[in-house]
Design a protein with these regions (language model features):
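Accessory regions of macromolecular translocation/handling assemblies
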Residues: 1-266
Length: 266
């Protein structure tokens, strides 16, 4: 006679219950992607552009991730200018909106990619958002797109049709509307995942940028604790040259017992 055990059916019930989870987060892996393509109507592309900029900015320290923007309407993107993630070492913003700014940023970007390729040094991660390509596909920068992830960089191209996307896009995001879309992996075209997203207004995005703009984090390191230089008077504990009794120091010094080398200050 067999005795039924309710626990034997429990694993199958749990599996069926959680086989599909509603409202689970869907993400694109920027860190391991050389390039990501976003396809859709202009309005939907702009909505996704804002979502990506805000999401990356609020989740990552501006010293770890830097953004580069290639846009065609400077006034439309006025809200993003004060974002600290757009700053660079020259004190300017990584925004391309005309030919003059294009030449400067492309030169800096090409130099950075070349430096990383040769030294394998990646001081911070870069996300390049291309809303208007400004000829980047024909620039020497384009030869780095294929292996951009290895150089700590990801390119995100926003186009109205998939045919306009460059090669080497590891993932393609198709925006079906301003609330829905799907993401497809280039390695497996059958691997398509649907998702829903919420668009934010320029005012909301600008408010987030205004909160992030004044944030400053002082980096902790040895440079802040060690002095870069020290005067000879401080080292000898004197205030004037007259305080230095050379005769006494010479007679008391026993340099033959050691070979001292100055390392620092106690």
């Amino acid at each position: 006679m067999e005795v039924g055990d309710e626990l034997t059916d429990l694993p199958e019930k749990i599996c069926d219950m959680y086989a599909k989870i509603d409202h689970a987060p869907v993400y694109t892996d920027f860190k391991n992607a050389n390039a990501v393509g976003v396809v859709g109507a202009k309005k939907a592309l702009y909505a996704m552009f804002k979502n990506i900029v805000i999401d990356v900015s609020v989740r990552h320290y501006y010293g770890d991730v830097r953004l580069f923007l290639l846009v065609d309407d400077e006034k439309q993107y006025e809200w993003v200018r004060m974002l600290p993630h757009l700053g660079n070492d020259k004190g300017t913003r990584n925004i391309v909106c005309n030919n003059e700014s294009k030449n400067n940023l492309f030169e800096n970007l090409f130099r950075e990619l070349n430096y990383r390729e040769q030294t394998k040094n990646i001081p911070y991660y870069c996300v390049v958002l291309v809303e208007n390509e400004f000829g980047i596909k024909n620039h020497p920068i384009s030869r780095y797109i294929e292996n951009a992830a290895e150089l700590g960089m990801t390119f995100v191209f926003f186009e109205t049709s998939a045919e306009k996307l460059p090669l080497h896009c590891d993932e393609i995001i198709t925006l079906l509307s301003e609330q829905q879309g799907n993401i497809c992996h280039s390695e497996n075209g059958n691997r398509v995942q649907d998702f829903e997203y919420q668009a934010i207004s320029d005012m909301q995005a600008g408010a987030v940028v205004q909160m992030l703009a004044p944030v400053y984090c002082e980096e902790i390191g040895l440079e802040n604790s060690l002095r870069k230089n020290i005067t000879l008077f401080e080292l000898l504990h004197i205030f004037a040259a007259e305080d230095l009794d050379l005769g006494k120091r010479w007679s008391e010094s026993q340099i033959y017992k050691t070979m001292a080398a100055p390392l620092g200050v106690n």
